[in-house]
Amino acid sequence: VSNAIALRKSFAVIRQRLPGQTQPVEFQPRVLFNPDMKTANFMVPGLIGIVLQVVTMFLTAFAVVREKENGTLEQLMVTPVSRLGLMVGKLAPYAFIGAFEVCMVVLLMRFLFQVPIAGSILLLAGFSLLFLLTSLGLGLMISTISANQVQAMQIAFLVMLPSVLLSGFMFPQESMPFPIYVIGQALPVTYFIRVLRGIILRDAGFIELWPQAIGLIVIGGFL
């Protein structure tokens, strides 16, 4: 929107300087991926990533710490179940909740907010699954380092604040100072928002979005 306004002002200046002359070239600005300049077309796809991270991260953040407070974590550790099996058992219900949430939010975006989906639904589903696993890992890490549920909630809120402000959801990252920009690159939701807007608005394919996949895989592997 700001670029369109600046472009319009530039054309007005040109017309003022050449009032009585015929311009050999007529400038007509054209918006490619959001021609109606609807705010919902830009904000709602990014909102999918924010909502998905909020729900999955907060639910998972309480998964292990609740067992610590109830004193049942030690009992689970001495069972024949492996640590991998225990982790999968803890995360599986939240993964199903996250998948259901993605379906519901996409349906609301399409039919309630009337945002068209230009790209591949299958590609969107694949990236959503990758981001879902990364977000679950982030919530599990918060749950592991927290001593109680209050502390887990505080850390989760501490993670969510930069996720909303620095991920490009509200403000373009290109206009941020470099240190703030670097912090934004460490957030998994940054890459997922780029994927969402790329697929939904620009019909972007995997060839264009593979750097975002690498970013999610690296962060997910670290978590």
Question: Predicted regions span which residues?
Answer:
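A hydrophobic alpha-helix feature that marks transmembrane segments and, especially
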Residues: I50-T72, L91, L140, T144
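Residue-level hotspots within the lipid-embedded alpha helices of multi-pass solute transporters
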Residues: N34, L47, V51, L59, ...
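Hydrophobic transmembrane alpha-helices
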Residues: I50-V54, A95, S128-L133, L158-S167, ...
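Transport-system extracytoplasmic interface segments
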Residues: V1-T56
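Alpha-helical transmembrane segments and their short interhelical loops
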Residues: R83-F157, L161, F206-A213, I217-V218
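Short helix-to-coil transition segments within interhelical loops
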Residues: R66, Q75-R83, I145
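Hydrophobic alpha-helical segments typical of transmembrane helices
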Residues: T60, G71-T72, A95, C103, ...
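Membrane-interfacial helix-loop-helix junctions in multi-pass membrane proteins
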Residues: F33-M37, P116, G168-F222
